[in-house]
Amino acid sequence: LAKIFRNQLSGRAPPARPQDARTWRETMTPIITAFERSPDGGKGLARDTRVRWALEETGQPYEVRLVSFQAMKEPAHLALHPFGQIPTYEEGDLALFETGSIVLHIAERHAGLLPGDANARARAITWMFAAVNTVEPPILELMTARILESDKPWTKDRLPLVMDRIRDRLTQLSPRLGKADWLDGAFSAGDLMMVSVLLRLRASGILEEYPGLSAYVARGEARPAYQRAFEAQLAVNTGKPPTG
């Protein structure tokens, strides 16, 4: 973690590319991009935390290139992420964007986040899609209404509607989890993505209305790999090396 922290602050360029392309792909440490200063101040809500978590769960070293909001709109970054967002993921000749895609790539390449059984593997991937396609959209609507549209005349009427849509999703999700620790057997990339999405509800108080889901998120946060990922992104915002 200390090495990663030093690379984050220095913006160190990646090592020179070896002549052997196969060696390059196999030995190149992945580089992800993250906010130079996260809008949440290091609460772990920026999407690079999901990618850090996946890399930590699979025991993979990585480097971080910090980018400013201005740099995110410049050609060099847009070549990696056409929508000018973070994170991006570079590994040799491969460049990816979108956290679902990045986490799936990591999970498929390294052991620890997808089951060996083909059917269980497919279900874990399904939960990844459910997290970002079904559960997250109304949560993002809530954040948009509260943060970016708080001064708009329609916000007061819109907020209750958005919160009801979130409750609908949580009411559907809660019985699927039931009393189990994770969504489908052992912890998987599906849980990683779902916990990451639900963490965005922490400040709203809605999650506490669903004790089973609240405990589920707490289990995810308690995982050592999540703790390492959280500390690494927090260090960027505090300027202090991770404690782990």
Task: Write out the residue ranges for each language-model feature.
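Cationic, amphipathic, low-complexity segments that mediate targeting or membrane/lipid association
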Residues: L1-L9, P15-Q19
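GST-like domain detector, emphasizing the conserved glutathione-binding G-site
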Residues: Q8, T23-R158, R167
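Short, solvent-exposed turn/loop segments enriched in Gly/Ser/Thr/Pro and often Arg
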Residues: S68, A189, Q233-L234
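Phosphate-coordinating loops and pocket residues in cytosolic domains that bind phosphorylated ligands
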Residues: A79, A222, E231
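Active-site-flanking alpha-helical
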Residues: A107, V197-L198, F230
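GST-like fold's C-terminal all-alpha helical module
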Residues: A131-A222
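Terminal-tail/helix-coil boundary detector
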Residues: E231-G244
